[in-house]
Amino acid sequence: MYKELGAADHLRMLALEESELPDVVLLLGIFDVHRGAERFAAYLEGAQFSRSETSAGGLPYYIGTHAGTRVAISGCFGGPMAALFAHTWCGAGVKTVIQLGWYGALQPGTNLGDVVVPRHAERQDGVSDWYLAKGILADATPELAAAIVRRLGERGISTSEQAIYSTPALLAESREVIADWSRHGWHGVDMETAATFAVAKSLGARRAAALLRIDDLISEEHSIAEGLVGDNRTFMRGRERDVMHAVIEAAAL
């Protein structure tokens, strides 16, 4: 039933006409999906909120612009929510989806705010198997990922392009599990990227991700149980804005 929905159905769920579609959709992986999306929307020009009660599917999002590019942003937490938004936007006709958010470091030597633009994400998210056959990578579009890396470099932000691991269960990450992921070479862990990549790939859309390092799971520094305060918080707010602007500019190339 829902798999057979067409573009007109997805547009109706978004309460948009085809001519109103954004050039790029940003999916923000974050705990507080509403306030998080609101915060990032403030980095856009003229961002307008689509109230869920005006949309048949109840899908909240903001639409604004940056440097002449029309951008939509939705907050999502975990693979199922990311997949729902990615499927709806891509199904409506959007051609570019970029995952933003944070990752936990699985390798030593990273710093708060370091950025990873992953080549692919390990499919342990719980959703991607519904979109891609076993053995098919949930990977970024190489040209888009490379453009993001270049744009970030122009802003003085260095990046890693190593693969990450997408998990469905953040609080189940024991020290033993973390050590195993690290031994297998994963650069970091998040919850949404594999799902977003899988959906976008299956629906023929360009996709990439740019994630900021929040907690170091090796040294156990900057634990999410403690939160960020003071200068660290101020730094991360500026970094997230710069990364968001860079990925939009890269998508427009």
Predicted regions and their residues:
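Glycine-rich beta-alpha junction loops
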Residues: I30, G104, Y165-L170, A195, ...
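Short, basic, glycine/proline-bearing loop/turn elements
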Residues: A67-G75, A179-H184, N232
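Active-site rim beta-loop-alpha module in soluble metabolic enzymes
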Residues: L137-H184
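His/Asp/Glu-rich mid-to-C-terminal helical/loop segments that flank catalytic regions of hydrolases
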Residues: S219-L253
